[in-house]
Amino acid sequence: MISLQHVSLVRGNRHILDDVSIEMKSEQNWAILGRNGSGKTTLLEMMTGYMFPSRGRVEVLGHVYGQCDVREVRKSIGYISQSLLEKLTLSDPVWEVVATGAYAFLRFYQDIPEEARNLAYSLLNEMNFGHLAEQPLGTLSQGERKKVMLARSLMADPKILIMDEPCAGLDLYEREKMLQEIDNLRQREIMVVYVTHHIEEIVPLFTHVALMKDGRLTGAGTKEEVLNHELIKQTYDIDAQLEWDGGRPWIKVISGG
């Protein structure tokens, strides 16, 4: 579904991405981990066609970027990010915000099709959010808004869902509720690509992990192969132990490491 071959992005003398090659298949769900500035978000922007490489080849859903209409490819990609959330209108009712996802609008300026309204309500009910459907988006907590973004991203029934730190800024309770909704995506035929700083956010949904440092991959493969002491130390520059509990990895920093 997603193939990057020897992708580099150069700005001045800086390699933001440096010879990145990775293959993501339809039956796989990927988490991308790394420190701030490691190139994670830039990698997502390559996948969505909002940035193009200085060198290399990007292929998504069988389409090679630079040889296709990227706007058409994006219709099959759901996207969640804080920057997108900030562009939405806080006074709009929740169901309407969700419904805009069917058309890639930020808000409606005309009558909303009944079909879109019904699907928006259905997705909100699926997430036990139906009681908030008529509330203005601005009255919701940060965690609730993130769930609205998730419902919105599913409106167009995408083949790929790309999430850029969807749990950033959430307290422990709201983070775990959001992660539960993300893990429930196992029930859908959709490939998920998820960027985070935090290893413990890798819920059982995710089958594969890519580790990034300074614009390069330090590891990529199944989560069992990649999440090990040596690669974590190499990626995060810290000595830590990794433990698995409840199908999720948890990290413990070694004192003095």
Predicted regions and their residues:
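Helix-to-loop junction immediately C-terminal to a conserved catalytic motif
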Residues: 48
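Conserved ABC transporter NBD signature motif
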Residues: 56-66, 73
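Conserved ABC ATPase signature
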Residues: 136-140
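Catalytic Walker B motif of ABC-type/P-loop ATPase nucleotide-binding domains
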Residues: 161-164
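ABC ATPase nucleotide-binding domains
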Residues: 234-257
